[in-house]
């Protein structure tokens, strides 16, 4: 979870360094071709990024834990506090660590969708969330990489959903869309969670799309892996 945002960014946020040394640390840890300051001081920039990261963590734990309590669950397993914490750490850091051999297949649809949405969010450049917080929506709309990233997810989800729907017998279209959206966000962000037992059960076209997304990766400045959309 600490490594998701970057251990060097963590060091930058909480250890005293000169501004000249800080920029080298931030560039070394940055996952994209460019690195910029959100505010004038790099230490404050790192702290803002970590506060957003921590906020996502707290929100996802709450959604997972209280969601199953409030809305009920249609899965075999229920998201207790321990499960919520483990899966949240695996989601926001895009590390994908789980506690069941079947992945997330036997958790509720609600829990799967919460995790999918947070995987998608954590694949976006964290600078974008800061711009949203300070009300600079025009700059957010100009973020070309984010729109390409969302476009890849939408097109891939629709393509895989219909491909699977017409290739697998007795499969509801809603389930096809749910599983395809989850797997697309999981693969493009390099998280690796799964809601299906075996990808080999899917058609070759769907497997190929996921294979390509694995290399493309998420946005620069996110916690996701891959080559990055900006490149």
Identify the meaning behind each predicted range.
Residues 1-231:
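Membrane-proximal intracellular helices of multi-pass ion channels
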């Amino acid at each position: 979870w600490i490594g998701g945002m970057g251990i060097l960014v963590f060091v930058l946020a909480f250890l005293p360094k000169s501004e000249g040394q800080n920029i080298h640390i931030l560039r070394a840890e940055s996952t994209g071709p460019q690195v910029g300051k959100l505010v004038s001081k790099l230490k404050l920039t790192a702290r803002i990024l970590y506060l957003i990261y921590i906020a996502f963590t707290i929100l996802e734990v709450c959604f997972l834990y209280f969601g199953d309590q409030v809305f009920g669950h249609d899965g075999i397993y229920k998201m207790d506090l321990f499960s919520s914490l483990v899966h949240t750490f695996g989601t926001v850091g895009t590390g994908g660590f789980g506690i069941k051999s079947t992945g997330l297949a036997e958790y509720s649809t609600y829990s799967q969708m919460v995790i999918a949405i947070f995987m998608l969010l954590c694949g976006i450049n964290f600078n974008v969330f800061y711009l949203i917080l300070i009300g600079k929506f025009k700059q957010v709309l100009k973020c070309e990489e984010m729109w390409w990233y969302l476009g890849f997810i939408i097109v891939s989800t629709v393509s895989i959903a219909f491909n699977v729907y017409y290739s697998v017998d007795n499969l509801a279209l809603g389930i096809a869309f749910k599983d395809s959206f989850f797997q697309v966000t999981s693969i493009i962000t390099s998280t690796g969670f799964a809601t299906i037992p075996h990808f080999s059960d899917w058609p070759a076209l769907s497997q190929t799309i996921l294979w390509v997304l694995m290399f493309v990766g998420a946005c620069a400045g996110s916690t996701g892996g891959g080559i990055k959309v900006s490149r």
